[in-house]
Amino acid sequence: MTETFIHLDKVRKSYRTRDEDFLAVSDVTLDIDEGELVALVGPSGCGKSTLLKILAGLHGFDSGKVDIGNPANPFIPGRDIGMVFQQPLLLKWRRIIDNVVLPAEILGLPKKETYERARELLQMVGLGGFESKYPYELSGGMQQRAAIARSLVHNPKLVLMDEPFGALDALTREKMNLELLRIWEESKKTIIFVTHGIQEAVFVGSKVVVLSSRPARMVDHFKVDLPYPRNLDMKTHEAFGDYTRRIYKLLGMQ
């Protein structure tokens, strides 16, 4: 039986500006199991990224509880987390492999083993042979693949992805969704994937969490009962349409 890996209980987060206070996240309660690929979907600006930053330990929160890990699989903040952002954020003066090893380098992990793992990860994300290239020599999609490899190099237990394919063209985005699913099935990591794309959420997620407009409240969450490995033909299936219509309805768009 799969154990709960992340538990949020009535998490609340507000911000103070010069003119006013505003609530970004309101009483979110959620359980995520080990090895799930959870898609967080909601309108732009609703607080999805704020929730992700709370999980990453980059933001505090006003009240509630956040537990990550369990007795069988303890979690070390900072060490056991990987992040992928909307932009690849590769250092232009470092080769691709030197960008990939950066988190492990910061953590002081053994250099030889780190570079071996980086080469394996670049192979896994389809960038074998590009180790010595520089970021400007790669397309946007290839740079984002390198960013995914970088997020995995220190073998984190949790990977947080904040609209990682939002800046890509539609065709490259579809390819990257397929790539993400393949990487997830190979790595068995717990992944939280933020998107405002409803079809994208259903396609990549083993579970979908639907958030309201700001402040982010959890409207619903459900398992996506579509088989793996997934392919683009699934978007024509009746069940896929049912899931997307469910989300549209939950967001008041139908």
Labelled PLM ranges:
Residues 41-43:
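The feature captures the beta-strand-to-loop junction immediately N-terminal to the Walker
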Residues 101, 105, 112-130, 182:
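Conserved ABC ATPase "signature" region
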Residues 94-101:
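Short coil-to-helix segment of the ABC ATPase nucleotide-binding domain corresponding to the Q-loop/switch region
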Residues 64-77:
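Conserved ABC transporter NBD signature motif
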Residues 56:
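Helix-to-loop junction immediately C-terminal to a conserved catalytic motif
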Residues 133-136, 154:
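Conserved signature/switch motifs of ABC ATPase nucleotide-binding domains
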